[in-house]
Amino acid sequence: MNQSAYTARTGSLRAWGAPQVTVGGGNYLGELVTRYLLGERNYRGARDHLTPLDPEALTVVVVDGPAGLTPRAPLAMIDTAPAMHEALRQLVATGKSEGLTHAALAQSGVCEPQRWLELSQLNVAHARLLDDDATLGVGRYVGEWEVNA
């Protein structure tokens, strides 16, 4: 788990400038945003690896794409980031990827390459890219997948 996305203030977005927002649990930014969007329900905690998946549960994966898509991005402009952003858009849209490696992801400014590699190994039955954004220089994607067991 990316420790820069961790807060000791359980269930609070205070560390990210929203002290008035509490969501009842979670310590990682991805967990907190997921809880904010999905509301109250029975959650399992964040974990380091995606698999094994539970076919009876909704699994929400929160991971950023390249963080070097513009000169003002967190990692400044990285020449290979735009092509990687497009490759990750296609992965989210189709569930398929070709030639995705840890080294290529890391060199393109992806801070959690292992998470993307785990996603690329899933047996995806249906994939759909709902939205993507890179206006702040970091690739962000929203998609839904149905995976085969």
PLM regions and their residue ranges:
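Catalytic metal-binding/acid-base residues of hydrolase active sites
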Residues: 2, 63-67
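Flexible, D/E/H-enriched segments
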Residues: 1-49, 74-149
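Extended accessory regions or peripheral subdomains of proteins
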Residues: 66-75
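Beta-strand elements within well-structured catalytic alpha/beta cores of enzymes
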Residues: 56-64
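Short amphipathic alpha-helices and their capping/turn segments at secondary-structure boundaries
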Residues: 50-55
